[in-house]
A protein has these predicted regions:
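Helix-rich cap/lid subdomain of alpha/beta-hydrolase
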Residues: 22-63
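Active-site nucleophile elbow and catalytic-triad environment of alpha/beta-hydrolase enzymes
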Residues: 72-90
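Acidic catalytic loop of the alpha/beta-hydrolase fold
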Residues: 70, 105-109, 136
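Conserved hydrolase catalytic core segment
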Residues: 1-12, 18
Length: 158
């Protein structure tokens, strides 16, 4: 958000502003120690893939996808830490009307942190929470509701 960007509308689904599961203290400490000397060192993410969607086929496809990595480098970890803080601090600078979509049972990201970020927005905004839905809303039982919310937001006046 350093350079001016003209956006008509923004749609954000399950933003990673904080993870929705505890990161072991030893991983955080190791990432801090290793970052300057071995930034490419990687750790397993520890995601519970059964929490991506209520549809077991989503987990199966995720595991079979050769482009999906189950690890994160310490460089990427620290970049994400800084980006999360930056996104939270700069929330009031977002001026485009913003739609936030989250599943209430998302355990991949922190829904509470997403709602806190949403509360910092000063632009026109709407938050749609999908009760019982997991992380990948577009692959969950609420898919049609999500598509309607996106369509309605995209076509809304203003």
């Amino acid at each position: 958000m350093d350079a001016p960007v003209s956006l008509h509308r923004v749609i954000i689904q399950a933003p990673l502003l904080e993870v929705g599961f505890p990161i072991p203290g030893w991983k955080k400490a190791a990432a801090g120690l290793l970052a300057p000397m071995w930034p490419t060192c990687s750790f397993r993410l520890g995601l519970d893939l059964s929490k991506l969607s209520h549809d077991p086929a989503v987990e199966t496809a995720y595991r079979a996808d050769p482009l999906v990595h189950q690890a994160i480098s310490v460089r990427t970890y620290w970049s994400l830490q800084h980006a999360k803080v930056d996104a939270f601090e700069r929330a009031p600078a977002l001026h485009a009307p913003t739609l936030l979509l989250c599943g209430t049972d998302d355990r991949i990201i922190s829904v509470e942190r997403a709602q806190q970020w949403f509360g910092r927005l000063t632009c026109p905004k709407r938050c749609v929470m999908f009760p019982g839905a997991y992380h990948e809303l577009h692959h969950d039982a609420v898919r049609e509701e999500v598509m309607r919310a996106v369509r309605d937001w995209t076509l809304a006046d203003g």
